[in-house]
Each structure stands twice: as C-alpha cells, then as structure tokens.
Amino acid sequence: MSRKLCTLNFTLSGKQGSLVIRDIQLWSNRPTASKSTSELRGQFIQYVDLAKLPLWVRSTNMNTYRCYSTSATAQAYFKSKLRNANRGIVIELSDKVDQRSQEPAYLIIFRENTELNCFQVDLTMKHEFDGQVTKLKQEIGKTRASVSKEGSIDIIIQQSQQRKIGTKTKVYRNVHINDKRLQFNETLSKLILGGLRLRGISNSITDYQKLYKVTFDAAEFTHRDELKRISMGSGEEVSFESLQETVETLLKLFTKS
C-alpha cells in the first residue's frame, strides 16, 4: 500500500525574485519505519540528462518515490520542464544531509511515461571512488618524489593547477549560461501567471494549463534567437520589458473571445 512520506517545496531563484514550487507529495510503495510525514525544503540546482549520469548516482536497490501535486503552478512547471523523456531536475535539500559525508543531499525528479517520480542521489560509491583516487595519488606522489627532480615535480604541479583553472572557468561559464536561461523561464512564468490573474482566469478553468503552456511555448519561440545566443554564451538576458510585451500580446491573442 502506498504511503505519503513527505511534502517537498523548492525554490527557483533569480534576479527578479524567487518562485517557490510547492506541495510536491512524495509517496512510497515500500514499508518505512516512520509513520509521520514531514516537509522538505530545497533549492533548484540544474537540469540533467538522465542517460548521461554516472552509474554511481543511482544504486540498484534504491527507492523510487511517486510524486503528486495539487498545485497548478507545480503541475505547469513539471509539464513544461520534463517534456523530454531523459530530463531530470536536480534539487538540493536544505534540511537533509548525506549521512556518510555530511554533505547536502540531492533529489532528482523525472518523468517516466505519464508518472512523476524522484530518487535521492546515492553518494556512497562516489565516496569510495574518491577515497581510492586520493590513496592512489598519495602513493604516486611518494614514488615520484623519490625518483624525480624538484623541477619536474614543480612542472607537474603547475600543469595540474592549470587544468583545475581551465575546468573552473568552463564550469563558471556554464553556470552563467544556465542562470540566464533560468532567469528567462522564471520571469516568463511569473508574467504569464500574473497576466492570467489580471484577466480573471482561474486555475480551476479546464483550459488553464493548456493556455499557460501555449503562451509559454509561443514566448520561447518569439525569443528563440536571443535564447540561442544565450546558449552559446554570447547573448545578453532578454529584458523584462520585452518579455512583458510579448506575454501581453500573446494573452490578448489567445484570450480574445
């Protein structure tokens, strides 16, 4: 028998403010020791391709939880962001840590057919790999120190530092691009929801979700050139005024009786 484990709320942050995705209920088909439900809080980290995740992320005996939500905003968000079968949403939990490393715990939310599921990232194997790599580096370092000249060691250290700098630069660039795209999505979502409210369109109306999605997709298409430049790292953020004008034009068109 399925049992509700907890309720998850997570934040999408941006320069224009924060949007909270609320009331995501996690249910399990497996028996658990705890009988009380709790509330988890989290922060959106990024979108991932599930097919490209390392094998250690998900163990074979890991629990997969079913996700439900009565929130129209949450339903619209997941419908928009999980259209691709292999896409996942990474959430860092604010009040839960990995028991072994005491590092933040992470959930990945994904869609399987028509069902919304999630699982917690398993860091156990990663820590084992990290430990083995650290030990191997120490052993190699001792061997090289005994047979190498001081100058060659300096070169190795310098090359290692240069590789680290190059990796960090690439990561910072990707994070900057993701931040711009996330800011666009957050601002667009808020403008659409606000425009629907101003027009007295309640989320209880049958075509509410369809109208939201059609407006969202049309706005993305309208600004496709700017979004393409952003994805290449050469574009500026789409201005709030430009996006607001697009949404108003689309809503006038789609809600015209």
Swiss-Prot record:
Tell whether Cytoplasm is among the UniProt keywords. yes
Query: Which UniProt keywords are present, listed alphabetically?
Result: Cell cycle, Cytoplasm, Cytoskeleton, DNA replication, Nucleus
What is the predominant subcellular site recorded for this chain? Answer: nucleus
Which InterPro entries does the UniProt record give?
Answer: Sld7, Sld7_C, Sld7_N
Sorted alphabetically, the Gene Ontology cellular component annotations on this record are: cytoplasm; nucleus; spindle pole
Coiled-coil residues: none
Homology family? Belongs to the SLD7 family.
Listed name of the protein? Mitochondrial morphogenesis protein SLD7
Species of origin: Saccharomyces cerevisiae (strain RM11-1a) (Baker's yeast)
Gene transcribed to yield this protein:
SLD7
